[in-house]
Amino acid sequence: MARRPRAKKKERKNIETGVAHIKSTFNNTVITISDVRGNAISWSSAGTVGFKGSRKSTPFAAQLAAEKAAREAMEHGMREVAVMVKGPGAGREAAIRSLQAAGLEVSLIKDVTPIPHNGCRPPKRRRV
C-alpha cells in the first residue's frame, strides 16, 4: 500500500503588528485580522460564532466574533492592530471595543466605507 502524505502542521507565525478589517453590513459582521502585507491570520463572523438569521446583525454577535478573531491572532503573537472599518452595520463600535478588551492595542481606526460617485441604484425604500 502507498504511504499517505503527512498533513502539513499549521505553523506559528510571530507577527506583532497587523490590520483588523471589520466589515459590518446590515445582516452580518465579518472580522479579518491580517499582517501588514494583507495575508490573513485569523477571521471570524457573527455566523461562525453561532448566530443565525437576524441575530447576526446585533452588536453582541459582532463583539463575540471580534473576541474570537483577536484570540486567534494573539496566539500568533499579535499585540497591536490598525482597524479598518467598512460598512454601515450595527456591529462597528462593538467589534472595535471588544478587540481592545481582548488585549490588542488599537493604534489607528480608519473608516474605509466605499462611497459611490453616483454609481449603482440603491435598493428601494422599505414601506412598513
Swiss-Prot record:
GO molecular function per UniProt: rRNA binding; structural constituent of ribosome
UniProt keyword list: Ribonucleoprotein, Ribosomal protein, RNA-binding, rRNA-binding
InterPro entries: Ribosomal_uS11 (IPR001971), Ribosomal_uS11_bac-type (IPR019981), Ribosomal_uS11_CS (IPR018102), Ribosomal_uS11_sf (IPR036967)
GO cellular component: ribonucleoprotein complex; ribosome
Domain of life: Bacteria
Gene Ontology biological-process entries: translation
Subunit structure: Part of the 30S ribosomal subunit. Interacts with proteins S7 and S18. Binds to IF-3.
UniProt function note: Located on the platform of the 30S subunit, it bridges several disparate RNA helices of the 16S rRNA. Forms part of the Shine-Dalgarno cleft in the 70S ribosome.
NCBIfam families: PRK05309.1, uS11_bact
Family statement drawn from the similarity comment of this UniProt entry: Belongs to the universal ribosomal protein uS11 family.
Name used for this protein in its record: Small ribosomal subunit protein uS11
Organism: Desulforudis audaxviator (strain MP104C)
